[in-house]
């Protein structure tokens, strides 16, 4: 089972709000997830993360998506790099 750290959209029409979640890569964007690691509000550029849990999942092989990797660099998680296939 390949596990990704990705954004799950929430909120209403024209007011997006995202949850940063750990999910199986085959599950839909707003579908089931394993664990919620934080939130991202693009309207206020506010990011809230459970940093120890993010590090735990990355050390266990979870791959962050390109967008999440960019968000993880913001609070200073140097270990979180963009996945290799995102350099297209």
Curated annotation (Swiss-Prot):
GO terms for biological process: translation. The keyword Ribosomal protein applies. SUPFAM superfamilies: Ribosomal protein S16 (SSF54565). Keywords: Ribonucleoprotein, Ribosomal protein. The keyword Ribosomal protein applies. It holds the Pfam family Ribosomal_S16. GO terms for molecular function: structural constituent of ribosome. InterPro entries: Ribosomal_bS16 (IPR000307), Ribosomal_bS16_dom_sf (IPR023803). It comes from the Bacteria. Belongs to the bacterial ribosomal protein bS16 family. This is Small ribosomal subunit protein bS16. It comes from Sorangium cellulosum (strain So ce56) (Polyangium cellulosum (strain So ce56)).
